[in-house]
Design a protein with these regions (language model features):
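Short S/T/G/P-rich N-terminal loop/turn motif that feeds into the first structured element of a domain
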Residues: 3-80, 85-104, 109-129
Length: 129
């Protein structure tokens, strides 16, 4: 259940009786990229293509209401992740629209990158503690 704020809007939600409360939700887009000839990320063509795709979509993602965008890259396990975090209310509106049209477009282009695999999406709570 959500806890109303003093102004009547929703501020926090609880995950049952777990003691976990949150006010922000992130939509994560992730994949595995292939290492370059060196065996690492520095010369990875697929990592460069992932970054180029994110650069293309970043202005559109930042236009989402109250969105913050983070990127995580692991050079050891070859992860490329993008998280779009919004307060509950704003995220709910985007989720209600099936994350369209940005997610469908981005994921289709991500899947088309040579060397990219395990393309997935996930909705997660995201809190600074």
């Amino acid at each position: 259940p959500a806890t109303p704020s003093r102004t009547g809007g929703v501020r926090m939600a609880d995950i049952g009786d777990s003691g976990v409360s949150f006010e922000n939700v992130a939509r994560e887009w992730r994949c595995k990229y292939t290492p370059g000839a060196s065996g690492g990320p520095g010369d990875s063509a697929s990592l460069k293509a992932c970054q180029d795709l994110l650069t293309e979509y970043l202005p559109k993602l930042k236009e989402l209401p109250k969105a913050s965008v983070t990127r995580q890259v692991c050079g050891g396990c070859m992860d490329f992740k993008v998280s779009i975090t919004q307060p509950l209310e704003e995220h709910g509106a985007w989720a209600g629209a099936d994350y369209g049209p940005l997610e469908e477009e981005f994921i289709a282009k991500l899947k088309a990158i040579d060397g990219v695999s395990q393309v997935e999406t996930q909705e997660i709570t995201f809190e600074a503690l």
